[in-house]
Amino acid sequence: MTRLNPYFGEFGGMYVPQILMPALIQLEDAFVSAQSDPAFQAEFSDLLTNYAGRPTPLTLCRNLTAGTRTKLYLKREDLLHGGAHKTNQVLGQALLAKRMGKTEIIAETGAGQHGVASALSSALLGLKCRIYMGAKDIERQSPNVFRMRLMGAEVIPVHSGSSTLKDACNEALRDWSDSYERAHYMLGTAAGPHPFPTIVREFQRMIGEETRAQLQEHEQRLPDAVIACVGGGSNAIGMFADFIDEPAVRLIGVEPGGLGIETRQHGASLKHGRTGIYFGMKSPMMQSAEGQIEESYSISAGLDFPSVGPQHAYLDSIGRAEYISATDEEALDAFRRLSRHEGIIPALESSHALAHALRMIQAEPEKEQILVVNLSGRGDKDIFTVHDILKARGDI
């Protein structure tokens, strides 16, 4: 059986308890064989098209760029069934779980989007599903919690640590250590132990492939830059993957700047963390001086993660991709501007990427450029959060 490289440069690896090694090796073998199995690929493709609704549109913004020479396109992952890009790769992983004879799915979720995607794919394919979610995230994402339960998933609150995504990940891994013979751990981002970063990238890469084909149709050329938010990094690596070998295309990842990098209330682990071992991988992460994992912070639950996928760390280390941050305030402003001027309510996660695109446009209004923002999810789940913030300010 072909073995995949577990590393991206110095980043990645399989830093897990010995008990989980057979499960990871079984998963890698199943993935490698599925990649060359026409029947698996046909079923995956059929689900993406006829269940999830691919391809998603590439929408040209009509109003946000008025008075500039920029063309700003949005890759509309918000229109995918389930409301975000998460649906792509969970369908692939659910099919892998069935292929391996597993009957249960374990997942973690922050914003609830991966939880919803895990629940819908489990319901579709007849798998039992339990989802770990930080108690704090359950409070701020109640619509998604109800959606998960409606589709038959058990949602398990996690009260340890910061009661957010980091802690949900830890609990999910603990569960998997006890149940891996019957359960598949459906990791929600392009991070964690090998082979998850590679599997998730490959099951998300249609985002960039479609973008390239659609832009070729609209503009007959490649974009100048593709921009995506980065928490763990799955939507970004899905967008970047097809453009990595195109040096003329800038790859820009936008981390959560929270209340400002100087406050340490942020989640910008790639540019402001240190390399260490966490969540089964070697990658940059937010650490205290003593090397303890620090709590991350973001207005966006889905970006509230103290590390980042190893391929992003590698792309940063070789200078192929650029990583910057956008603050809560900048994301909130982008959220409101897209809603007001284009009639599209984006997820707060995606709003970070949009915020940086708007900064780029504002900095060089006379520059002729084509930018693509991966609108990774829709903002229905965030309207109560935004409403409460604006109400407290007397701004609605």
Swiss-Prot record:
Highest taxon of the lineage: Bacteria
**Enzyme Commission no:** 4.2.1.20
Which pathway? Amino-acid biosynthesis; L-tryptophan biosynthesis; L-tryptophan from chorismate: step 5/5
In-chain residues carrying the UniProt-annotated modification N6-(pyridoxal phosphate)lysine: K86
Required co-factor(s) are: pyridoxal 5'-phosphate
InterPro entries, per the entry: Trp_synth_b_CS, Trp_synth_beta, Trp_synth_beta/beta-like, TrpB-like_PALP, TrpB-like_PALP_sf
The protein's UniProt keywords, in alphabetical order, are: Amino-acid biosynthesis, Aromatic amino acid biosynthesis, Lyase, Pyridoxal phosphate, Tryptophan biosynthesis
PROSITE patterns given for it?
TRP_SYNTHASE_BETA (PS00168)
**A Pfam family name for this chain?**
PALP
Single annotated GO MF: tryptophan synthase activity
**Catalytic reaction(s) noted:** (1S,2R)-1-C-(indol-3-yl)glycerol 3-phosphate + L-serine = D-glyceraldehyde 3-phosphate + L-tryptophan + H2O
Q: Name one GO cellular component term.
A: cytoplasm
Family to which this protein belongs: Belongs to the TrpB family.
Note the subunit structure. Tetramer of two alpha and two beta chains.
Q: What does this protein do?
A: The beta subunit is responsible for the synthesis of L-tryptophan from indole and L-serine.
State what protein this is by name. Answer: Tryptophan synthase beta chain
Q: Which organism is it from?
A: Sodalis glossinidius (strain morsitans)
